[in-house]
């Protein structure tokens, strides 16, 4: 099975942006989210990873804009950012996206998260944003500024709740073009009992080939952001490299 690539469109203040290590204020702007998403579709993407950064950081929302973008795309969309209650979840699913990512809510409101997973199954994935501090794997929430507990304890709970998919990010790698944390991906895939999507750090076609080596271990896909925007490789090149 070939690795699924999900080009990312991160949206802040109505613009497509990329951050460094997820930090607010580190944005580089790349124009219209609609144009970015349609460009990835035209380049052969099967999925687009669409993120509302303002909602993730709790400083507003781009909900209507994101709904328009999802409506215009013919490919599948994974929608993420600030989905922390029924109202936000219902609105996100109503866009017609294929699935949503829960992040902070999975850490701060386990009961609600369990209920969302029970109700929507495959349409709900959980984002595990990991920071390795002195050897400990800590989870980060609220746009990566709050501590969300121990990765392995939270993963055990989510596994018991029947979570269908995990998006795993090493936050120290995201937006840095320094290569993915392959060890972390393999460790999570080894205990998750569900498919894992890699996020953060991809800088080259070799990085994607290395992630693709983990498909047999349970890594299903990779989100690619800055490397595409920075011109390290094209999406058609990336698709060819992993298929």
UniProtKB/Swiss-Prot annotation:
What does it catalyze?
1-(5-phospho-beta-D-ribosyl)-5-[(5-phospho-beta-D-ribosylamino)methylideneamino]imidazole-4-carboxamide = 5-[(5-phospho-1-deoxy-D-ribulos-1-ylimino)methylamino]-1-(5-phospho-beta-D-ribosyl)imidazole-4-carboxamide; N-(5-phospho-beta-D-ribosyl)anthranilate = 1-(2-carboxyphenylamino)-1-deoxy-D-ribulose 5-phosphate
Q: From the UniProt record, give one GO term of the biological process aspect.
A: L-tryptophan biosynthetic process
Q: Does the keyword Cell inner membrane apply?
A: no
Q: Where is this protein found?
A: Cytoplasm
Gene3D superfamilies for the chain:
Aldolase class I
The entry's active site is 10 (proton acceptor), 129 (proton donor)
Q: What class of enzyme is it?
A: isomerase
Q: Which InterPro entries match?
A: Aldolase_TIM (IPR013785), His_biosynth (IPR006062), HisA/PriA_Actinobacteria (IPR010188), Isoase_HisA-like (IPR044524), Isoase_HisA-like_bact (IPR023016), RibuloseP-bd_barrel (IPR011060)
Cellular component terms (Gene Ontology): cytoplasm
- What pathway does the UniProt record associate with this protein? Amino-acid biosynthesis; L-histidine biosynthesis; L-histidine from 5-phospho-alpha-D-ribose 1-diphosphate: step 4/9; Amino-acid biosynthesis; L-tryptophan biosynthesis; L-tryptophan from chorismate: step 3/5
Keywords, in A-Z order? Amino-acid biosynthesis, Aromatic amino acid biosynthesis, Cytoplasm, Histidine biosynthesis, Isomerase, Tryptophan biosynthesis
Q: Which SUPFAM superfamilies match?
A: Ribulose-phoshate binding barrel
Query: According to the UniProt entry, what is the EC number of this protein?
Result: 5.3.1.16, 5.3.1.24
Q: What is its main location?
A: cytoplasm
Does Cytoplasm show up as a keyword for this record?
A: yes
Q: Which GO terms describe its molecular function?
A: 1-(5-phosphoribosyl)-5-[(5-phosphoribosylamino)methylideneamino]imidazole-4-carboxamide isomerase activity; phosphoribosylanthranilate isomerase activity
Database matches in HAMAP family: HisA (MF_01014)
Question: Which family, according to UniProt?
Answer: Belongs to the HisA/HisF family.
Q: Could you tell me which PANTHER family the record lists for this protein?
A: 1-(5-PHOSPHORIBOSYL)-5-[(5-PHOSPHORIBOSYLAMINO)METHYLIDENEAMINO] IMIDAZOLE-4-CARBOXAMIDE ISOMERASE
What function does the entry list? Involved in both the histidine and tryptophan biosynthetic pathways.
Task: State the protein's name.
Answer: Phosphoribosyl isomerase A
Question: What organism is listed for this UniProt entry?
Answer: Mycobacteroides abscessus (strain ATCC 19977 / DSM 44196 / CCUG 20993 / CIP 104536 / JCM 13569 / NCTC 13031 / TMC 1543 / L948) (Mycobacterium abscessus)
Its taxonomic path starts at: Bacteria, Bacillati, Actinomycetota, Actinomycetes, Mycobacteriales
């Amino acid at each position: 099975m070939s690795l699924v690539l999900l080009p990312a469109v991160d949206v802040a203040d109505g613009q497509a942006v990329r951050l460094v290590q997820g930090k607010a204020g580190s944005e580089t702007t790349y124009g219209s989210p609609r144009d970015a998403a349609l460009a990835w579709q035209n380049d052969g993407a099967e999925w687009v990873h669409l993120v509302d950064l303002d909602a993730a950081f709790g400083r507003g929302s781009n909900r209507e804009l994101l709904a328009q973008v999802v409506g215009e795309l013919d490919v599948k969309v994974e929608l993420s950012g600030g989905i922390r209650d029924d109202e936000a979840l219902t609105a996100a699913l109503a866009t017609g996206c294929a699935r949503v990512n829960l992040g902070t809510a999975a850490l701060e409101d386990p009961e609600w998260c369990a209920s969302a997973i029970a109700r929507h199954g495959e349409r709900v994935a959980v984002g595990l944003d990991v920071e390795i501090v002195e050897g400990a794997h800590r989870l980060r929430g609220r746009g990566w500024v709050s501590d969300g507990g121990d990765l392995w304890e939270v993963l055990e709970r989510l596994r018991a709740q029947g979570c269908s998919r995990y998006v795993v990010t090493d936050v120290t790698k995201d937006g840095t073009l320094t290569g993915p944390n392959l060890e972390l991906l393999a460790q999570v895939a080894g205990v998750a009992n569900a498919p894992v999507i890699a996020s953060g750090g991809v800088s080259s076609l070799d990085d994607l080939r290395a992630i693709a080596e983990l498909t047999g271990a349970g890594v299903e896909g990779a989100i690619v952001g800055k490397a595409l925007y920075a011109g390290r490789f094209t999406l058609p090149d990336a698709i060819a490299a992993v298929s």
